[in-house]
Amino acid sequence: MKLILIKDCPSGKANTIVEVSDGYAKNFLIPRKFAIAYTEENAKKLKQKLEQEKLDFSLKTKEFLELKEKLEKLKLTFKLKASLDKNHKLETHHSISAKKLLERLHELGFDLPKHSIEKVHLNLIGINHVNVKLFDKIVAKLTVVIEADV
C-alpha cells in the first residue's frame, strides 16, 4: 500500500511517500496517525506543503542573516569591579553571564530566546567574543568589551 508519512517513524521520515504492506498500513501507521493514504489530492497537498516550508525557511534564513549582521556590528560594554592582585595584574571580582548579555540585548531592542547564547561567564578584561545561535546554522559572533572599574 502506498502512503504519505505525516510523522517520522521506522518506515521513514515525515513528508515522504513510502510503500508498505497492507496490514502494517491499516493496523499500525494509519490508526496511529503516522500516515495517510496516497491519493493524487493528498500528493498535491504534500507538494504544496513542502514548497511552502521551503519558502518559509528561505524567508527566515534571510531575516536571521540580517539580524546576524546587526549583532556582529554591535559592541556591548560592561564595567566590572577589579583590583590588583599580588602580581600587580587586574583581577575581576564578578563576571558577565549569558543572562546579563540577553538583558542588555533586550534593552537595545533585540528579543532573543534565552537558549540562543551559550552559557558563559566572561571575566577577562578586554575584548571577548560570544557565539549567538540564531537559526539553523546561523551563528553571530557578538563582541563584548569588559572594562575595569578600579
From Swiss-Prot:
Q: Which Pfam families match?
A: Ribosomal_L9_C, Ribosomal_L9_N
Q: Which GO terms describe its biological process?
A: translation
Q: Which GO molecular function entries does the Swiss-Prot or TrEMBL record give?
A: rRNA binding; structural constituent of ribosome
Matching entries from InterPro entries are given as:
Ribosomal_bL9, Ribosomal_bL9/RNase_H1_N, Ribosomal_bL9_bac/chp, Ribosomal_bL9_C, Ribosomal_bL9_C_sf, Ribosomal_bL9_N, Ribosomal_bL9_N_sf
Q: Name one GO cellular component term.
A: ribosome
Keywords in alphabetical order, please.
Answer: Ribonucleoprotein, Ribosomal protein, RNA-binding, rRNA-binding
Function, as annotated, reads: Binds to the 23S rRNA.
Give the record's family classification. Belongs to the bacterial ribosomal protein bL9 family.
What's the protein called, per UniProt?
Large ribosomal subunit protein bL9
Query: Which gene name belongs to this protein?
Result: rplI
